[in-house]
Amino acid sequence: MFRIIKWLIALPVGIFIFFNAYVYGNIITYRAVAPHRTAFMSMRMKQFEQEGRDVALDYRWMPYKRISTNLKKALIASEDARFAGHGGFDWGGIQNAIRRNRNSGKVKAGGSTISQQLAKNLFLNESRSYIRKGEEAAITAMMEAVTDKDRIFELYLNSIEWHYGVFGAEAASRYFYQIPAAKLTKQQAAKLTARVPAPLYYADHPKSKRLRNKTNIVLRRMGSAELPESDTD
C-alpha cells in the first residue's frame, strides 16, 4: 500500500519535472531559433479539423527589425503597457484578475502579460484552471530569466493568432492588407491589434462595433507605448 502511495506521488512529480526540463530546453533553443510551430497552433489546427473546417496554417516567421514599429507600439499599448519594465508579471493586473475570478467563482480573467501570453502560446493550451496558470507562471519566469525582452517580443509577434489559421505579424499583414509587416500604418496596426483578444470572434464579425471602438482606443494609446530598450527599429 505504501509503495502504491509513493508511486502516486512520484509519478505526477516526475511528469512535472520532465515537462519543465523539456520546456527549459526549448526556451534556450528559441533564443536563437524560430519555433517550427507552437503548441497553441497545433491545438487550434486540430480543433479546426475536428470541426470539419478546411483551414490551412499560415505562419511566416519575420525578424523583429522587419516588423513595423507601429504594430509593436499598438500591441504594447493594448496588451501590456508595462512590458518594457516588468519581470514577466503585472502584479496589479494579477490582483485585479484574482478578485474578478473570486467574484465569478471561475477562472475567467487572467491578468496576463505579453510574456505570459507567449508562454501559453509556445507550450500550453487554451484551458483555464489554477494549475494551468501556475504552469504558465513557471514557464514565464524561466523565459524571462534567460531571454532578452526584444526576443520575447519577437517570439510573441510571430505567434499571435489573428484569424482562422493565420498566425504571426507577417501572415496577418499579408492576409488583411496584402503588404509586409514592415509597412503597416498606425491605423492598420491598431486594427490588427484590436482583434488579438478574440481573433476568431472578429473573423466571424468583421464589422463589429466593439472592433471599431477597440481600434480607436489603441490608436489613442499608441503614442505613450514604451518599447524594450534594446529595440533599435
UniProtKB/Swiss-Prot annotation:
The keyword Glycosyltransferase applies. Gene3D superfamilies: Biosynthetic peptidoglycan transglycosylase-like (1.10.3810.10). GO terms for molecular function: pentosyltransferase activity; peptidoglycan glycosyltransferase activity. The chain crosses the membrane at residues 8-28. GO terms for cellular component: peptidoglycan-based cell wall; plasma membrane. It catalyses: [GlcNAc-(1->4)-Mur2Ac(oyl-L-Ala-gamma-D-Glu-L-Lys-D-Ala-D-Ala)](n)-di-trans,octa-cis-undecaprenyl diphosphate + beta-D-GlcNAc-(1->4)-Mur2Ac(oyl-L-Ala-gamma-D-Glu-L-Lys-D-Ala-D-Ala)-di-trans,octa-cis-undecaprenyl diphosphate = [GlcNAc-(1->4)-Mur2Ac(oyl-L-Ala-gamma-D-Glu-L-Lys-D-Ala-D-Ala)](n+1)-di-trans,octa-cis-undecaprenyl diphosphate + di-trans,octa-cis-undecaprenyl diphosphate + H(+). Its EC number is 2.4.99.28. Pathway: Cell wall biogenesis; peptidoglycan biosynthesis. Keywords: Cell inner membrane, Cell membrane, Cell shape, Cell wall biogenesis/degradation, Glycosyltransferase, Membrane, Peptidoglycan synthesis, Transferase, Transmembrane, Transmembrane helix. The keyword Transmembrane helix applies. It comes from the Bacteria. Belongs to the glycosyltransferase 51 family. Peptidoglycan polymerase that catalyzes glycan chain elongation from lipid-linked precursors. PANTHER family: BIOSYNTHETIC PEPTIDOGLYCAN TRANSGLYCOSYLASE (PTHR30400:SF0), MONOFUNCTIONAL BIOSYNTHETIC PEPTIDOGLYCAN TRANSGLYCOSYLASE (PTHR30400). This is Biosynthetic peptidoglycan transglycosylase. It comes from Neisseria meningitidis serogroup A / serotype 4A (strain DSM 15465 / Z2491).
